[in-house]
């Protein structure tokens, strides 16, 4: 938790992307409590042109990966196509699946019903459920 970035819940109970809190020795106990209560989430960097690396060990990992992949924050600015430019943000590393229900339809296919907070990808969840070796089936 020390050095991790955490975002608190917004007024709807989902992750508040506008408030990034760095875990320190002073707030660690409270942040751990809030994360266990589902009122805060540890987040990872989704890089963009206005991003800054996280402090501490996490930031060193970010720098290492970006260097190995030959990626820089400025690479996320797309000249002449501003709609493709990414400013950067943080996303929860784990998220609760809400109201998950499933059934098998009349053709024998599974049907899932659930909802996720804003910024969480249903395709990622379904990929984890399907666990196919063939990435083209998603």
Which residues fall in each region the model found?
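Non-catalytic, substrate/partner-engaging modules appended to enzymatic cores
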Residues: 1-138
């Amino acid at each position: 938790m020390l050095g991790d970035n955490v975002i608190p819940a917004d007024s709807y109970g989902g992750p508040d992307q506008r408030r990034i809190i760095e875990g320190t020795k002073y707030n660690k106990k409270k942040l751990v409590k809030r994360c266990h209560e589902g009122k805060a989430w540890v987040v990872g960097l989704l890089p963009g042109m206005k991003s800054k690396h996280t402090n501490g060990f996490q930031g060193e990992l970010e720098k290492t990966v970006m260097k190995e992949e030959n990626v820089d924050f400025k690479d996320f600015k797309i000249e002449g196509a501003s709609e493709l430019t990414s400013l950067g943000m943080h996303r929860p590393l784990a998220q609760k699946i809400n109201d998950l229900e499933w059934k098998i339809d009349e053709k024998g296919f599974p049907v899932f019903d659930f909802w996720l907070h804003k910024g969480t990808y249903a395709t990622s969840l379904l990929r984890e459920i399907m666990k196919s070796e063939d990435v083209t089936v998603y």
